[in-house]
Amino acid sequence: KVYLKHIVNGQEVMMDSAVVKNRCFHFEGTAPKDVEAAIITGFDNGSAQLLLEPGNIKFKPFDGNFPVGAKAYGTKNNDIFVGYAMLHSKNADDAKVNIVTLRASLPDSITNDDRKYMPYHGAIFNANGVYYKADVMDYYLKHIDSEASLFILKYDLYYMFKPKYLHDVFMAALPERLHSHPIYK
């Protein structure tokens, strides 16, 4: 059995359950008024995340042994989140390439001496962080008219910027219609 849950006041609350047959399961019902984050649990190794909204939400690739690797798609906001997950992967890959490129550009006398190498590594680490923040901000602004932008704000931008900057820049940029969403409040 698997369970569809959402978080209410920090607690997982079950919304529905389904029996797994032939490695498939199905939930059917009325979506909440506001798009909300949900999880599917009941697996041995974690859960799968999704944004609960009207439509036919599917997962790919879905492996019960590694459910956290599955991405929800098939609806506007879940498709935006798939793109967001790909952005995370791309940034991680780019960061690795940047570090490898840096190491290859330095003489052995620096790369073999941690004291000499650490300032270079620290600089590329910080640069990778700036590139990541810039990409997140760009993606957020490209999708600012969607409810998914609220979740990007909550799960990523919230940890990157001071509250005043978050409010004055990112929240102020949101369309008026999203101001009534519970996450905005």
Name each region found by the language model:
Residues 157-161:
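Short coil/turn linking the two alpha-helices of tandem helical-hairpin repeats
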Residues 139:
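Conserved functional acidic sites
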Residues 132, 136, 163-175:
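Alpha-helical repeat scaffolds
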Residues 150, 164-168, 184:
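Conserved positions within tetratricopeptide repeat
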Residues 142, 146, 176-184:
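Short solvent-exposed coil/turn linkers within tandem alpha-helical repeat scaffolds
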Residues 1-134:
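A non-transmembrane, solvent-exposed segment enriched in polar/low-complexity residues
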Residues 145-156:
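Amphipathic alpha-helical repeat scaffolds of TPR domains
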